[in-house]
Every structure is written in structure tokens, then in C-alpha cells.
């Protein structure tokens, strides 16, 4: 039976809901892309200048072709940014976020020179883990799905067939033995916990079973009448408030690496066979220490798998569990998509090389582990896809970039251009200046911009030069900050926000001022040592850096150089080509460039507003009670039954959790907690107005 036959998929249309309509080059680009995809072209390039709305064009393309879509992005930060944009544009469709769930990850490794074995060590971000499970759940239960993912999506994941085989189907009126259902939940790696009810656990209260699936924020309640499922409800796991009644629900396994008893028994037999062969090899090479090490580690893992159906590092045995041949490709997120899915690769000039590099980096570490008896050779088949395996799995692909690479340009049959911005803004003018006296000239240009309440980006070649320049500018009264690789992600977001707000006027950086930096207030980008050929001054890097000034009406780029290199010439020629097209369009259509008004806001803003409101409400509720007792507000008749005193305690606790989540960059979780606090405060206000508080 196919996956589609086992699951009744939700089929809903992709629908963009926005106050804006396609403008500038967008209508033509959307029409051209749609025609090419519908005509079966396998590779399509969208050459979109910075600020032309490539993300919105992608959303409208998805609406036109009506296909599940995987959007691959170069890093987690841009993935989160893009996922939020798609959620705003397609609010009624499933927009999922799939990135590595490790906040910290140290893979197991062995250093032969010092005889040092490094154990695997990691810290998992639970909210990101939930979003990963949510992505696979959506892909298996509906078609209107967009998954925004980093290249981690090509790493091994359990097979969709086995994942669906472990699925438990719940339907009103079905006859099911309650104890048998509990055994099924345990079999797919859910844990019974009647005290601490959270994701991946279930609890039992008489004829009522409640479970929180790994991919859900809400819990499920199954009410039995004898051996019959009488009612199924979705409820709030914290308050017990019933959200809606369900007719049929699916509960997928609590791990992507789940295997039924029969498959696990076969896997154990295969592992034992491989172990016997490998031990013979090692002993034949007189590697007795390695043989003993491998015997102990593998035997322990086998005992855990026989007793528990699981072991730490079970992914290293995924080849045997999946029943794959040696050297064959693992399953990954792409295998969860239907055959007709669309692949979109954002900033393809950066993302594509990452895909190709993943396999070799992983393989060099694992070879050492296998050679020294820490892992069986089959562990090397728990890996990311090779480049050719990746190409075999993807169908039609759209490459998005302001500077497409040679690979995608060679693959595509023509290029779709998106040069005209909806705002009418044109690419910045590029001015070449001599390096002699460049710092004094830069200082004068900065002062001119500061008088106009505009911002400046300066990019240097070395860390030393960036530090010296920052110190020099500070000494001359310029409000300047230095953005470097040691600045953590949260502080980087704050720095960029402070630049836009005018807390300081100049930001100095090295290679941090390229893709994904959206700063409409910046009117000048100064590139020092522009004529020094290399990675940081390649044509691609220069075009991307020039694009940072493309969101301001009076944007300019100053290149300090004593000669014009080939890279400079290519970047300037491409910029001038785009400017000519943009100016001609504006003249023909009577368009006046309008400044881009982009809201300066983020999760920290909403948390600050929430804090002020919470403080006011709690003061009015007579806050000042003793601390130390945690409320247990799980009620079956909704929030109305929760005492006001407990509600106040709960609001305080969730507010603290909200700030903790934001501090750890768990913005999705922080936003969800903010919404929960809002609901609880609404209930408390109703109590106050009714005279109960």
C-alpha cells in the first residue's frame, strides 16, 4: 500500500494573501517562471537584483503551479527570515522550518596522533526539533506545504515508509483495546508520564488517554467507552481547555528512526553478521585493541536494541535498519516529498557549493572512527547525500540569486530576469576613488551622510584594518561599531537594528556585509582596497556588497582603488547594465523612486510591550503573594476554573520562560509563549471585570 493510500491527505490550494500586488518586473518574472515550470523545464534561473522581491515572486510562483515546495537556504538565520515571509504571504498553508536542531554539536571523533577519543556531545533545541517533526508530518498529511530548510535536509533521516508504518490511526467509533493502544504508543517511542506531560509523552486517567505528539503544540485526548473510541479532542496541554473535536487523527512516531519488531530483528542479525566479519579482519591485521573496542561497543548497542528497540547513536546502524545495501544513499527529507515537488535554491551561488561539500567533510571523520574500531564500516552509510545522489532525487529546480554561479547558468535554458524594483529604486551609482587619502575622504563622506540622517557601511579586507579604522573614526567623534566574526548571532541582530535606529551611524565589517542584509537607511557603502583580487573582492562578492546600498533612494558605492581589476569591471558593468534598465523603465512609466519603508521591529519589541502590559495588569491584580509554589492549572473545564491567584503565578512563570527563550534565540518559542501570556491576561482581565480577582 502506498503512503497516499494509507493517509487521507488534506488538499487545499496555495493562496497568497497580501495587500501588495506584483509590481515592477515581478508580473513578467512570475509569468515567465510559471510557463517554464509548466512546460517541464528542469532548471530555471531567476536573476533577481537585490530588493526586487524575489521571495514574494517565489510565493506567487508557488500559487500559480500549486506544488509542494522545498526552499533551500544557506543558513539558519536566513531560513527563519524566509519562513516568516512565506507565513505572512501564505497564512492558510503549511509553511515549515527544517534546520539542524542542535544548538551545540560535537560529533564523535578520534585523533590517532594523541590517542584521543571525543564522545558525541550535543545540546538539542526542543522547539526546532518540534518544527522538524512538524515538517515531516505536514508532508505526509497534506499537499499545500512549503518547507524552508538549510542544507542539513540532505542528511540521513529515517525512511518515510517505516515512519508511516509506525503511525497509529485513531478514529471515532473504532473498537480498540486501550492497553493495546498504550503498547502501540510505547512501540513508537512515546513514554508514559502521568506527572510531567510534555511532547513525546502520554498519560492515562481511567478511560481517558492523552498524548502530545512530537510535532504538535497541542495534545490529543482519546476517551473510551469500553473498547470503543467514543470521542477525540485536541486540547491545550497546559490548561486542559478543549480546542476542537476530531473525527480522525494520526499519531506519528516520536522518532524518525523507528523500526517495527520484525525489521529490528532483521537489522540485529545483519549487524551481528557484519561485526563477525569486521572482527576477523581486524584480528587478521593484528589490531587486537581495535577488535576488542569494537566488540564491546557494538555488543552493548545490540543489547540495548534488543531490550529497548533503541540505542544511543542508532543512526549509525541506519543502513541495516533500512535494509539498504552497502554504499547506498540514505533516506532524507527530500524522500518525504511527493514526486512532483518543486525545489527552490535561494542564494544559489552560496548554497549549491555547500551541498557538494557536505559528503567529504562527513566521510573523513568517519573513516578514522571505523579504522580504529569505534564504529562498524556500515556507519559510513549514515551520511549526507553525495552530489549525484542529490541530483537524482530532485526534479524541477528554480535557482534564485543576484549573482548566479557558473553551474546553474550552464544548466538553465535561458534566464528569467527581475531587475525592476516595485519601489522604483535603482541600483546605486559606483564611484571609484584613489586609495591615497582614502580614510580622510571616507570621514568626509560619513559626515555628509550623518547630516542627512543616513547610515554608512564600510567593508575592509582584514580584522586588524577594521579595528584600526573603528578606533580612528571613534577618535574623530563618529558613532561607529565594528561587526566581526566573534559577535554572537543575537548581538549581531541587535547591532543591525541599532544601526537602523540611529544609535550609531557607521558599521565596519569584513565579510559580513553581503547576502541577507536588509538596511534601507544605508545610503553609502564604502569598499576599501577594492582592487585587491581575492575571495572578498571577487565579482560576485562586489555585486552582493553593492546591493547593500540598493534600498536607498540616494544610494552610492565608493570603491577605493588605484586600478580597475577584472572583478571590479564585471561588477561595475553589471551594476550599470541594471541601472540603465531601471532608469529606462522609470522614465517610460513615470515612476518616481520611493524610499523603502521597512518596519524596524523584532521579537524583542513585542516582548518589551508585553512586559509593560503584564506589569500593569499584575499590579492591578494585587501582586505580592508568596513565591515558591508552582501552580498546576490543568483543568478539564477550561481556564474559567483556574483561580485568579494561580493565573497570576502562571503569567509570571510564562513571562520568565518567554525571555529565556528569546535569550537563547528560540524566537518561535518566545513568540508562542508571548501569545499564551496574552490569552491568560485576557482571561484575568475578564475575571477582574466580573469581580472575581
From Swiss-Prot:
KW Plastid (keyword) present: no
PROSITE patterns: HELICASE_ATP_BIND_1, HELICASE_CTER, UVR
Domain UVR: 648-683
Domain Helicase ATP-binding positions: 35-188
Keywords of the record: ATP-binding, Cytoplasm, DNA damage, DNA excision, DNA repair, Excision nuclease, Helicase, Hydrolase, Nucleotide-binding, SOS response
Binding site for ATP: 48-55
Helicase C-terminal domain span: 438-600
Region of interest called Disordered, as start-end residue ranges on this chain: 612-634
Primary role: The UvrABC repair system catalyzes the recognition and processing of DNA lesions. A damage recognition complex composed of 2 UvrA and 2 UvrB subunits scans DNA for abnormalities. Upon binding of the UvrA(2)B(2) complex to a putative damaged site, the DNA wraps around one UvrB monomer. DNA wrap is dependent on ATP binding by UvrB and probably causes local melting of the DNA helix, facilitating insertion of UvrB beta-hairpin between the DNA strands. Then UvrB probes one DNA strand for the presence of a lesion.
Protein name, UniProt field: UvrABC system protein B
Organism (species): Renibacterium salmoninarum (strain ATCC 33209 / DSM 20767 / JCM 11484 / NBRC 15589 / NCIMB 2235)
Amino acid at each position: 500500500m502506498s503512503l497516499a493510500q494509507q493517509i487521507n491527505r488534506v488538499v487545499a490550494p496555495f493562496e497568497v494573501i497580501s495587500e501588495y500586488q506584483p509590481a515592477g518586473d515581478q508580473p513578467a518574472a512570475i509569468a515567465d517562471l510559471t510557463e517554464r515550470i509548466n512546460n517541464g523545464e528542469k532548471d530555471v534561473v531567476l536573476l533577481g537584483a537585490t530588493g526586487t522581491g524575489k521571495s514574494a515572486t517565489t510565493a506567487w510562483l508557488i500559487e500559480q503551479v500549486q506544488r509542494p515546495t522545498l526552499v533551500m537556504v544557506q543558513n539558519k538565520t536566513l531560513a527563519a527570515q524566509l519562513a516568516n515571509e512565506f507565513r505572512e504571504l501564505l497564512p492558510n498553508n503549511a509553511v515549515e522550518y527544517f534546520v539542524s536542531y542542535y544548538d551545540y554539536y560535537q560529533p564523535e571523533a578520534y585523533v590517532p596522533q594523541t590517542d584521543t577519543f571525543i564522545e558525541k556531545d550535543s545540546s538539542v533545541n526542543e522547539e526546532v526539533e518540534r518544527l522538524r517533526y512538524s515538517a515531516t508530518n505536514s508532508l505526509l498529511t497534506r499537499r499545500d506545504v512549503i518547507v524552508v530548510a538549510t542544507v542539513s535536509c540532505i542528511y540521513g533521516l529515517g525512511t518515510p515508509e517505516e515512519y508511516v508504518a509506525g503511525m497509529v490511526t485513531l478514529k471515532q467509533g473504532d473498537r480498540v483495546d486501550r492497553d493495546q493502544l498504550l503498547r502501540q504508543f510505547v512501540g513508537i517511542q512515546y513514554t508514559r508520564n502521568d506527572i510531567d506531560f510534555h511532547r513525546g509523552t502520554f498519560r492515562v486517567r481511567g478511560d481517558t488517554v492523552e498524548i502530545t505528539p512530537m510535532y504538535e503544540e497541542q495534545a490529543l485526548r482519546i476517551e473510551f467507552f469500553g473498547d470503543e473510541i467514543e470521542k477525540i479532542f485536541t486540547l491545550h496541554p497546559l490548561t486542559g481547555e478543549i480546542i476542537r473535536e476530531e473525527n480522525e487523527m494520526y499519531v506519528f512516531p516520536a522518532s524518525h528512526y523507528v523500526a517495527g519488531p520484525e525489521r529490528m530483528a532483521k537489522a540485529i542479525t545483519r549487524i551481528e553478521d557484519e561485526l563477525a566479519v569486521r572482527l576477523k579482519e581486524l584480528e587478521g591485521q593484528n589490531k587486537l585493541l581495535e577488535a576488542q573496542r569494537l566488540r564491546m561497543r557494538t555488543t552493548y548497542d545490540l543489547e540495548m536494541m534488543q531490550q529497548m528497540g533503541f540505542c544511543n547513536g542508532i543512526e549509525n546502524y541506519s543502513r541495516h535498519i533500512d535494509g539498504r545495501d552497502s554504499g547506498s544513499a540514505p533516506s532524507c527529507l527530500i524522500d518525504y516529498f511527493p514526486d512532483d515537488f518543486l525545489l527552490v535554491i535561494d542564494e544559489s551561488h552560496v548554497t549549491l557549493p555547500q551541498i557538494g561539500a557536505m559528503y567529504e567533510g562527513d566521510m573523513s571523520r568517519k573513516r578514522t572512527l571505523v579504522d580504529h574500531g569505534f564504529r562498524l564500516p556500515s556507519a559510513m552509510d549514515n551520511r549526507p547525500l553525495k552530489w549525484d545522489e542529490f541530483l537524482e532525487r530532485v526534479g524541477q529546480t528554480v535557482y534564485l540569486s543576484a549573482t548566479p554561479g557558473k553551474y546553474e547558468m550552464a544548466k538553465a535554458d535561458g534566464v528569467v530576469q527581475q531587475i525592476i524594483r516595485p519601489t522604483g529604486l535603482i541600483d546605486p551609482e559606483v564611484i571609484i576613488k584613489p586609495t591615497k587619502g582614502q580614510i580622510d575622504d571616507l570621514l568626509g563622506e560619513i559626515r555628509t551622510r550623518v547630516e542627512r540622517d543616513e547610515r554608512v557601511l564600510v567593508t575592509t579586507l582584514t580584522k586588524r584594518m577594521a579595528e584600526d579604522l573603528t578606533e580612528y573614526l571613534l577618535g574623530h567623534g563618529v558613532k561607529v561599531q565594528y561587526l566581526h566574526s566573534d559577535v554572537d548571532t543575537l548581538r549581531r541582530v541587535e547591532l543591525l537594528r541599532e544601526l537602523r535606529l540611529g544609535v550609531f551611524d557607521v558599521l565596519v565589517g569584513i565579510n559580513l556585509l553581503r547576502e541577507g542584509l536588509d538596511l534601507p537607511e544605508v545610503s553609502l557603502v564604502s569598499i576599501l582596497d577594492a582592487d585587491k583580487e581575492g575571495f572578498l573582492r571577487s565579482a560576485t562578492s562586489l555585486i552582493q556588497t553593492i546591493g547593500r546600498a540598493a534600498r536607498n533612494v540616494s544610494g552610492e558605492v565608493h570603491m577605493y582603488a588605484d586600478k580597475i581589476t577584472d572583478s571590479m569591471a564585471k561588477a561595475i558593468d553589471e551594476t550599470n547594465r541594471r541601472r540603465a534598465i531601471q532608469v529606462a523603465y522609470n522614465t517610460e512609466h513615470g515612476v518616481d523612486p520611493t524610499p523603502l519603508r521597512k518596519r524596524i521591529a523584532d521579537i524583542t519589541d513585542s516582548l518589551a510591550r508585553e512586559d509593560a502590559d503584564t506589569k500593569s495588569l499584575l499590579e492591578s491584580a494585587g501582586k505580592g503573594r508568596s513565591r515558591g509554589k508552582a501552580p498546576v492549572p490543568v483543568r478539564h473545564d477550561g481556564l474559567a476554573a483556574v483561580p485568579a491567584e494561580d493565573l497570576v503565578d502562571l503569567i509570571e512563570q510564562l513571562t520568565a520562560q518567554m525571555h529565556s527563550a528569546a535569550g537563547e534565540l528560540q524566537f518561535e518559542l518566545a513568540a508562542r509563549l508571548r501569545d499564551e501570556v496574552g490569552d491568560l491576561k485576557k482571561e484575568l482581565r475578564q475575571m477582574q471585570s466580573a469581580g472575581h480577582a
